Structures are given as C-alpha cells and as structure tokens.
C-alpha cells in the first residue's frame, strides 16, 4: 500500500517534457501601455493576473475610444499635454522594448507609428501575429533574450511596452492578446526558473492592481467617437 502511494507521488512529480531556453539573468518585469481598448488593456490585464507591476502614460484627460481609461488602471499616468501620439512617444521612450501584437500585416495607423518611433529611438521592437501557431514561443524567446541584452549584468526590472490595435479596429483582439500573454507569463512562472512578478527593493512580491479589476474590462465595441483614435 505504501509502495503504491510512493509510486503515485513519484508519477505526479514527473518533470514536464517541455524544454525551454533560460536566460542567464532572471529579471523582474514591468508591463506598460497607453490604456487604450484592445491590445493595450490586454497587456495590463494579463500582467494584473500575475501581480506584475504595471504602468504607462495615457493621453491628457485619460482619453480612450470608449471614453476614458478605466480607474482600475490607477498606475497609469496622464501626459501633461498632448493626445494619442504623445502618449505613444512617452511609452516608447520610457520602456526598454516594445511588443506589438496584431491580427494582420502590414501595420497601420497608430500601431505603425509605434513601431516607427521605437526604431527611430533605438528601442527593440517585436511584432507578432496572434494567428501564428508559435506566437507564444516567439514572445517568450524574445523576452528571454532581452533579460540578457538589456543592461547586461544588471538585475533591475525590464520595462516592456505592449501595443497594438484598439478593439474597434480588430474586434476580439483584447481576448486573443490577453490569452496569448497569459500563456507567455505562465511559461515563465512554471518553467523558466522564476516568474515575472514585480519585486520591490526588499525582494518582496508586489500586487499593484487587484485582479478584480480584470472583470471590469469590456470587449464590446465602443460607441462612435468623433476624434481620431489610435
């Protein structure tokens, strides 16, 4: 009886067959975005689910295509002046790298502007099609490479700007992007020797936004807005 129990415990503890590359320098992460509907909020929602530090810049007035950026995203700050382009510029230059998630190529509108601005400012930028079968692997491997290439030898957090189309431009992209990012973060937590959680100066886990706020995010197409939105 005892032998059978021990065998069951051994079977349950079998190592996963997934073999993943590991960075040489495990680092905490911070996820930022402009708080727009769609990919921006998917990045924040996925980070919130893992208590990863979040932040970023919103347009002046916290503008978004559904009105204003939800109060649940209280770590986001308003740009002192300017609109969507100013928000984009500040998030790019305040980040170590930018991840762009899209349904189709080529990039257009504000998404294309984000990629162009990152290139002009020497910031790494990765564009991933959510429909790619290996989208999760692409993102995971790129993030691992950043842990070694961004300020090599340092242990400070890496700031990742997550960007892409708004919800009305790619209906359903919030859920697709969030699902993909949750898979990436799960890989890090389970298999990569650590997780992406925000860590304070004393090495303690920091839960920056309660997970309950994930539920207030809407996937419904917003009402018409007369101002150009990106």
Language-model-detected regions and their locations in the chain:
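Acidic/glycine-enriched connector segments
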Residues: 11-12, 16-159, 166, 171-188
């Amino acid at each position: 009886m005892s032998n059978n129990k021990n065998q069951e415990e051994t079977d349950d503890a079998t190592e996963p067959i997934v073999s993943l590359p590991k960075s040489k320098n495990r680092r905490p992460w911070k996820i930022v975005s402009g708080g727009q509907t769609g990919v921006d909020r998917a990045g924040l929602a996925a980070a919130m689910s893992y208590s990863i530090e979040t932040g970023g810049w919103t347009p002046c007035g916290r503008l978004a295509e559904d009105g204003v950026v939800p109060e649940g995203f209280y770590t986001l700050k308003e740009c002192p002046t300017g609109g969507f382009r100013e928000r984009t510029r500040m998030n790019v230059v305040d980040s170590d790298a930018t991840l762009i998630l899209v349904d189709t190529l080529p990039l257009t509108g504000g998404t294309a502007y984000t990629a162009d601005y990152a290139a002009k400012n020497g910031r790494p930028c990765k564009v991933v099609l959510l429909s790619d079968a290996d989208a999760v692997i692409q993102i995971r491997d790129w993030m691992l490479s950043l842990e070694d290439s961004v300020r090599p030898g340092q242990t400070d957090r890496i700031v990742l700007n997550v960007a892409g189309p708004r919800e009305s431009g790619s209906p359903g992209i919030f859920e697709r992007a969030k699902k993909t990012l949750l898979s990436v973060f799960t890989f890090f937590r389970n298999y990569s020797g650590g997780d992406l959680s925000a860590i304070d100066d004393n090495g303690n886990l920091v839960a920056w936004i309660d997970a309950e706020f994930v539920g207030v995010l809407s996937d419904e197409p917003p009402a018409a807005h007369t101002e150009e939105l990106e």
